[in-house]
């Protein structure tokens, strides 16, 4: 008789076989790949000994080039050389053109409104461009490690939404990589530092890359990494420092906009080189198309100071969300190449009141953390007790009668998570229910973001309030949401995977949070009014239906007139804006209809007992 082999989920069926896995930091400006070798997580270098791969792809008619060689072509072939593609994932063409009007690419819109880049090699979408970067990193890992990869962990900004996360996974699939997990970049940094230093307590991870900024407040305790709160800006990074400096140099050189694509790229390269030099020098000599001059670090810092302050505002919000004071933060982990900027380190240190940690290369720390996590998920460390708890950035809810939002999963809930709540029908004989999934902190649907709608059909016709519909929200480890609605008596159910078409920027997330606090009082007043209106509608509809069914038999003409007057008075109040007045009107109507309700109850009891003997009862 054959034996059935049993293995732990996600782990090798051959427990002593070491599986090859890698962590990939898919960055806006640069990307890296890391793996655990001989017990240590290290980044994997190319043939020239470089760990960094520029996130740049050049498409010529003959070939696809990725990395440094592609970057070298950017100045001469800007339309065919795609840079910072991470900013484009999960966004509509309209959104991209409004956010980044100076991009040198030739865009066109696909049938579903998504962006397509026209290159010498043909049309490419952002997912295909990302896939080419991932393919190059996967190839480097397999050549260095000497075998096929069992899987990869890919890092994403903490504020990437469903569309951006799904796009990243699709890119990996296109690159032929098996994704073990998507991991938030700040969480990956915490893994790298947490395991190395054995810290326990509250840690802030300040991640300023080329195109995105993330702040995460984490609590590290006995191997458990819990993200208390996150914040950031998906459209702020070192690239913006470059653009500000480029604009300044353009002004100093007396150049007029717009520049040609080639000159624009050359100017950005000068700005980037100048910015990097300021990490070592107080002033830099520049040559901008024949104009020669000196730029000081102080001038550069004056340009970027407002942007650094903007990151600190996000830090302040994240601390408030985590219910943590800046003084409670034990360590500040610096992540991302842009944290090499001296002003950034100085202002972050002043804000938190301590010198930031920079002992691990800020360019490599995220990839190293991802490499450690990939090694664990591949099953190479079955005894690992490390637990990872990410959070959702905005509450997930459902629309109820009156345009109200009922929150199912509150913001900053750790994931993966599943929450269920029961709802019922509003009208007699209702056989279908529309489920509207929303995201946000406000009390009314109109003030939140719509994610998806679907219908549950086949509900047995019953009296209003008799049906029981269980709605379940489930967010997986990658932050993707699925919603299920099930009618309990029949088991009929409907389900939807929520993948919004376009991304929600961190500025929009921050604005939604700020609006929820600014409008908290008026939101609660609006909710109270909506709730009373819904209750008034229920009372009015119920009383009218009862009078149509039994009014002629159980009520005198005068009693009918009195009840109709009560209904009219309640309708008038219901159409007003005074929640307290509507509540009182409901009480008055209930009181006026009390005798009628008693007579209907008596009639129902008599009908139920008709034809039965005492012994039967």
UniProtKB/Swiss-Prot annotation:
The keyword Nucleotide-binding belongs to this UniProt entry's keyword annotation: yes
Glycosyltransferase in keyword set: no
GO terms assigned for molecular function: ATP binding; ATP hydrolysis activity; ATP-dependent protein folding chaperone; unfolded protein binding
GO biological process: iron-sulfur cluster assembly
Family annotation (InterPro entries): ATPase_NBD, Heat_shock_70_CS, HscA_NBD, HSP70_C_sf, HSP70_peptide-bd_sf, Hsp_70_fam, ISC_FeS_clus_asmbl_HscA
Keywords in alphabetical order: ATP-binding, Chaperone, Nucleotide-binding
Pfam assignment, any one: HSP70
Matching SUPFAM superfamilies: Actin-like ATPase domain, Heat shock protein 70kD (HSP70), C-terminal subdomain, Heat shock protein 70kD (HSP70), peptide-binding domain
UniProt function note: Probable chaperone. Has a low intrinsic ATPase activity which is markedly stimulated by HscB.
Family that this chain belongs to: Belongs to the heat shock protein 70 family.
Alphabetical list of NCBIfam families matching this protein: HscA, PRK05183.1
Designated name of the protein: Chaperone protein HscA homolog
